[in-house]
Amino acid sequence: MSKRISLTQFLVEQQRQHGRIPAQLRLLIEVVARACKRIAISVNKGALGEVLGSAGSENVQGEVQKKLDIISNEVLIEANEWGGHLAAMASEEMDSIHVVPNRYPQGEYMLLFDPLDGSSNIDVNVSIGTIFSVLRKVGHQHGVSEEDFLQPGKFQAAAGYCVYGPQTTLVLTVGDGVAVFTLDRETGSFVLTQSNLQIPADTHEFAINASNHRHWAPPMKRYIDECLAGREGPRGKDFNMRWVGSMVADVHRILTRGGIFLYPWDQREPDKPGKLRLMYEANPMAFLVEQAGGAATNGEQRIMDLMPGKLHERVSVMMGSKNEVERVSQYHREHREAAGH
């Protein structure tokens, strides 16, 4: 049997050999992983733990909160606020940032997270997950504000997600490739099961909510119509559609075997650039996808180059296999040029 490498050992070796991970960042990632284990226990208990169903409240996005959304958010805050690695946290479930209380030491990092992505799938037992992103606090001034969080995704120090499915799997990057860890329930440790994950440049799978076809912009309609035309169409090959409705599950499949994930702008809410959150979902997933050799764009710009104007900013998302993402971007460019923009 090959030697099993735990998450802790992997991070320590990265710190020693490559200098990629400062000690504070390593400890922060370990705390996030421990919090994910606690969330996994609550998710796995399901109805037995009386954690399913709606909490009867809405988050800042105007979405009905599930009980597990609130539990997961509290787990992440409680686990991370006292360790001395963080200055503040921001969550999709909270209106404003959570500054580390004065009674605890403050660190140089800021943690952003979607505590339970895909939570609309909780009650039907479909894979859901936690997405997280780590930024460094810029400057040495005392205190931290919302403005400190407004950095392009290219400045992320680390990003990852934990998917709660048939296995509990942690997928992580610190800017040196993508590593996958599987939770060994017997020992309680995350164990390295894949390193240097790579997304194939070409694919025959796409992930999109096709029921919104009539609301899309012309370049998105063109791309999907060509995929659906299959072998007889301009692409000359058949495509499969996969859509779970949980970003973690859909992107995990794409990281594992290729594909393109699409959550575009649509005309039902024309003033909103998209539905997914730039800081909590798009940036960390874009970092992972790019580190795995893929690409991530909003149709006009690389996602990790976007300068956020506010904490809960939304964005169109097209990410995955590089050649397909480039094709979608090309269709958007051609449409803009034809329209004279």
From Swiss-Prot:
Record keywords: Carbohydrate metabolism, Cytoplasm, Hydrolase, Magnesium, Metal-binding
CC cofactor: Mg(2+)
Cofactor remark: Binds 2 magnesium ions per subunit.
Sequence positions that bind Mg(2+) 1: E92, D114, L116
Pathway it works in: Carbohydrate biosynthesis; gluconeogenesis
Xref: Gene3D superfamilies: 3.40.190.80, Fructose-1,6-Bisphosphatase, subunit A, domain 1 (3.30.540.10)
EC number(s) on file: 3.1.3.11
Entry binding sites for substrate: D117, G118, S119, S120, N209, K275
Family assignment from sequence similarity: Belongs to the FBPase class 1 family.
Protein name: Fructose-1,6-bisphosphatase class 1 1
Protein species of origin: Leptothrix cholodnii (strain ATCC 51168 / LMG 8142 / SP-6)
Organism lineage: Bacteria, Pseudomonadati, Pseudomonadota, Betaproteobacteria, Burkholderiales
